[in-house]
Amino acid sequence: MQDLAFHLLAFLFVAAFIAGFIDSIAGGGGMITIPAMLIAGIPPLQTLGTNKLQGLFGSGSATLSYARRGHVNLKEQLPMALMSAAGAVLGALLATIVPGDVLKAILPFLLIAIALYFGLKPNMGDVDQHSRVTPFVFTLTLVPLIGFYDGVFGPGTGSFFMLGFVTLAGFGVLKATAHTKFLNFGSNVGAFGVFLFFGAVLWKVGLLMGLGQFLGAQVGSRYAMAKGAKIIKPLLVIVSIALAIRLLADPTHPLRIWLGH
């Protein structure tokens, strides 16, 4: 399976670079990499496992880039990242038990709601606002819950973390983006460990795409730090709506099946 033709490997590398760029700013890289791997003929389970491997490079690259500029303190936020990883482990392990159809059915509408929130809310910039919950409560509740979701299903995880950081933690948009990437790295580590245990990782493909992700995330995170909320907000809105449309357009989407289309 890993002996893919050169043009397919080149295609996956480019897809990973673009995904790394977009994901480092607004999340949603999986909506590029997962279809790309399926198009290349990689089976669904190996696609999910390999996606987590290459995603580690993108989220890790963006996290380091943001941390070097002081937008996230890795030591201080490590407990939060560990809770995200723990949630993702449970999510990946329980993926067969959780009603996946319900998640798939409601996710597009949640993403549209997030897009509307970020698109219509005025005065949302890079300045921190008053927090609605303590960091302790945020770490013990929302973080593992979103990490769990990432392990079970995945698409839109970055949008949910962004929403939590902005609305509950009171973070500015750029700071929220930086912290989102670190927690996304944590959930990627957790879910990747489970897929690795079950042997669902294609190393050659994952490492090649990981290089593309790393480079794309370096470019994307630098662009985000240069432009701040001016680029992060609109890209987050676009990515959320695009992901919602892609999910609804899928013939296997539960809503389309229930409606008989």
UniProtKB/Swiss-Prot annotation:
Key words of the record: Cell membrane, Membrane, Transmembrane, Transmembrane helix, Transport
Cited InterPro entries: TM_pro_TauE-like, TSUP
Main location: membrane
Keyword DNA-binding annotated: no
Record bears the keyword Phosphoprotein: no
A cellular-component GO term for this protein: plasma membrane
Localization of this protein: Cell membrane
TM segment ranges: 8-28, 29-49, 78-98, 100-120, 133-151, 152-171, 189-209, 231-251
Pfam families the UniProt entry points to: TauE
Membrane topology qualifier: Multi-pass membrane protein
Family: Belongs to the 4-toluene sulfonate uptake permease (TSUP) (TC 2.A.102) family.
Name of the protein this chain belongs to: Probable membrane transporter protein ORF9
Species for this entry: Sinorhizobium sp
